Each structure stands twice: as C-alpha cells, then as structure tokens.
Amino acid sequence: MTRFLLIIILGFLLTACQQVTVDEPEFVPHQLTELRVGTLYGPQIYMTSGQGNSGFDYDMALRFAEYLNVPLKMVPYTNRSELYDALKKNDIDIIAAGMTETPARREQFRLGPPLYRVNQVLVYREGVAAPKDISKLKGRITIIADSAFVETLTQLQKHHPSLVWDQVTDKDSEELLAMIANKEIDYTIADSSSVQINRRYLPDLRSGPVLEEKLDVVWLLPPTHSDALMSQLLAFWHQEKLAGTLDHLNEKYFGHVKRFDYIDTRAFLRAIETVLPRYRQLFETHAGDLDWRKLAATSYQESHWNPHARSPTGVRGMMMLTEPTAKEIGITNRLDAEESIRGGAAYLRDMINRLPESIPESQRMWFALASYNIGYAHVEDARKLAESMELNPNAWRDLKKVLPLLQKRKYYQKTRYGYARGSEAVHYVDSIRRYYDTLVWVDNQSKQPMPEDEQNDLIAEELPSMPAGSLSPDQPK
C-alpha cells in the first residue's frame, strides 16, 4: 500500500515538473490596404475645410500613403488617451498629431524620425504683466491631461514645490488658447508653433518663458509588431528629407507666421467685419480661377481696402495700380473699386502665367506676388542668383533667402536688372500669406467641410507691413 502511494505521488511530481505549454493566439499583423492615421485637430496638424484638408502632419501622412501605394484614412480623436488606446489596440497604424518626443512616450511607443522642432512656452494674455518666474504666477495654469506639458510641469515642480496646475480632459489646445484670449483662464502651456499660428486670429495671445527648448515633433508607432512599418517610415523620411519636403512644409506652415504685429492684426480682424462685406462679392466675381481670399489679402496689403487710396509714387485704388499697368489691362478709372479689383486680378493672373512651368503649382502664387511687388524681371534675377548659389530657384523658401541680396552691390551688380528692394518683397509676400490665413480661418467658421472622400483628393496649397502703394511699380518686367 505504501509502495502504491509512493508511485502515485512520484507520478504527480513528474507531471508537475513537465513544462506546461499554453497555445497563445498568434499575432496577425494588419494588412496594410490603407494607412490609418490617428490624429488630433489643429491648424498645424490636421484641418478640414471647404478647400480640402491641410496641416503639416496631414501633408506628410498623405505623402507617406502615396509612398506605400495605399489610400490614406485620417482618423481624428478628441483626446490623447483615446489616441494611445487606439494605437495599442491596432485600430490605427500610426499617430500623426504634432506630438513631441518625451520620456513617457519613448517608454510606451516607438517614435519616428523628427519632423520639425518646437519650444514649450507659457502663454498669457495681452495686458497681463509678463511672467518671469513660473513659480510666482498670479493665477493658475490650465493644461490638457495626458499632454507633454504634464511631464514638463511635474519636473519643474521638483524644484518649485508650490507650483500647481489644473488638468482638463474636455478641451484641446486651440480651446485653451481661445480661453486665454477671452480671459476665462489665466495661463496655459503650448507649443511655440501653435501660438504663432493662433495669434493671427487671437492677437491678444502672448508667449512667456520658454519651459522646454527644441523639442522634436515625431510620429508614434505601436511598441511591438511594427518593424516593417518603421523601416518604411525611415526610408520615406530619408527620401523626403533629401527632396526638401520637410523644409518646404516648414516654410508652408510656419515660415510666414514668425513675424507678428499686434496692432495690424487687430485692425485686420476689424476690417474683415466692417469693410470686407462691401467688397467681398467683387473679389469673388473677379477672382476667376484664383482664390478670392488671396486676391482680397493682396488688396488689403496694398490699400487696406480703401478704393480711394493714393500714394506719392502715383499708384492708386484698391489694388494700387500704376497708370501704365492700368492702361495695359484696360482699366480707365483706378479709383473705381470694381475696376481696380478686376484689373488687379488680371494683372496677378498674368504674373502667374508668365512664370516658368518648373515652379510647382503650390509655389506659383508667392512667386507671382513677389513679381507683383518688385517686377517679374527682378524675380528672374533672383532665381538665376539662387541657381548660382546651388539653391533651388523653383522653391519659395530659397528665393526668400536670395531676394534681399538684390539690395547688396556685391550681388545686384552681377544681375541683368540691377538693384531691387528684395527684402520688402519677402515681407510683402509673407504679410499677404498671413492675411490670407486669417481670411481662410474666418471664412471657414461658417462653412461645412467637404466630404471626406473628396478631401483626400486635394493637397492643400501653401498658406501663407510693407507700405501701401507697392503694386506693379514702373520698372522692367
């Protein structure tokens, strides 16, 4: 009996020592028949409008989908927690939402290569004393839960124990900035690029101390089973970096918003409400295949929408046309608003058509406006100068670097048409781009977005104060 029990016990022990195997379901990777991109709404991230989709992350995602030869599916979420969960559950393939690299994100996800850099800044309202010490603020900081700003403040709190803040889950960055402008909250933290873009519509925003500098904005990939997608992303990034796409998009979304004039911005917003309604129909009618808002932005830069504007140099009217230019395009009364707008549109269209075909469609308007300002001949001089300096003569970002050189004897003496105030042309174009951005934002407030299937067929064009009276000067063209 004892021997029998011993045999049974030994049997149990042998069974217990054997390795127990559990059949786990094998991971089946998502077959990439489309690129599912999780994102957040924001002007520099992803926006939908009557003109299609736009945003740095959107433009890059669309190019990545084309690189992979699959359709793009943008999947907006309302907060970061939902985004993170969706990526972990394999509901999306990648997060492209203007997120910076942080220790917490490095621990949870795989991070793609850098797209651009931002600073984290404290944001307050015009009229409030500029804060110098974040631990001695007269008011409270409100930030978004699960954002990189939580990590930043947590680190600062170690050195400033009295530092406290509120976290919200039902707002986004744009809402918090609007709440600052509307005096609903005291302070928030935002990326510098977001502040620069939003103060075109909320001019009372002010940037305070920089809390974190030169943070890389990256895309997030799943922590596991993403080797193939990461390899493809790295190859794509390398290709686009060499092609100048990152520089192009940086110029497109951020190049023209770094300059800011508080008084001018407020005046422009007032003019949109009080003056533009009288002339909007004229801009829409005579713009033709141009975006009427670009035509209106150009007119504001020229005359502040004053049909009786005059300059000592002899230019007049809404579009500040010279007399020779007016005759050339059949305008008899430059002080008549409709005639001036019609003439300005025709002249701008002519400038666009004269440009070489090598200049991409998305850049042609900015080249044309520079031609509008200092003359086509000087723009051609600048393009040739750019080429001699091994810069791209068909990229506005490079022409911006070269145009100011036309004011230096070392350079203009080598050109065909000589001296030109190229730096003013750069400022002129950038100002129009800022006005255009603001008009688009205001116009879109009352419009419904296009259907999603139509939006992805469009790649948004580039968005983008010199003294009035610079339009179509009398010089070689």
From Swiss-Prot:
The reaction(s) this protein catalyses: Exolytic cleavage of the (1->4)-beta-glycosidic linkage between N-acetylmuramic acid (MurNAc) and N-acetylglucosamine (GlcNAc) residues in peptidoglycan, from either the reducing or the non-reducing ends of the peptidoglycan chains, with concomitant formation of a 1,6-anhydrobond in the MurNAc residue
Keyword Signal: yes
One GO biological process term: cell wall organization
Lineage: superkingdom: Bacteria
SMART domains, sorted: PBPb
CDD domains, A to Z: MLTF-like (cd13403), PBP2_YfhD_N (cd01009)
Pfam families: SBP_bac_3, SLT
SUPFAM superfamilies: Lysozyme-like (SSF53955), Periplasmic binding protein-like II (SSF53850)
Enzyme class, UniProt record, top EC level: lyase
InterPro entries noted in UniProt: Lysozyme-like_dom_sf, MltF, Solute-binding_3/MltF_N, Transglycosylase_SLT_dom_1
Span list, region LT domain: 258-477
Biased composition (Acidic residues): 451-460
Protein name, as recorded: Membrane-bound lytic murein transglycosylase F
Organism of derivation: Shewanella sp. (strain W3-18-1)
Gene that this polypeptide is encoded by: mltF
